């Protein structure tokens, strides 16, 4: 974990960041929360589902609730695209980080158009095939992190940092 954080900061060459952490509730949110040593002293906000685990874990955090379900749901993709435009215009993050799932897609594309750096962390349990979200955001990421060497065959420009969570 510390290696990842130092590496990320080195790559971005930014001392102070406004960070957007975007992810589905459940495991994706837990993974982002585990990056706390990185985001703890940063100006930050979250985008996730309005579910009990998210409300509990992020009770003292600035957060925006997105529309769900998101996986293969075109209606909510459109709604979340408009939400991304609204939230990102207001917040103007320097960096957007996600480990999935589909809610990350509109935030990454809109954020990239607005000049934010985007970093995607492919989930640990994917060691031989990509996630749909990973495939969709890979072309625009500033950094794409995988946790298995085998995944570099799928994502050649990815950085394998091993298990970071």
What are these regions (language model features)?
Residues 1-49, 55-58:
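N-terminal subdomain of nucleotide-sugar transferases
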Residues 18, 43-46, 62, 117, ...:
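Residues at the starts of beta-strands that form the adenosine-phosphate
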Residues 23-25, 41-80, 150, 161-164:
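Conserved nucleotide-sugar phosphate-binding/catalytic loop shared by glycosyltransferases and other
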Residues 24, 101, 122-125:
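Histidine-centered beta-alpha loop that forms part of the nucleotide-sugar donor binding/catalytic region
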Residues 72-94, 113:
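An amphipathic, basic-hydrophobic alpha-helix
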Residues 93-114:
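An aromatic- and histidine-rich active-site surface loop
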Residues 116-165:
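Active-site-proximal region of nucleotide-activated glycan assembly enzymes
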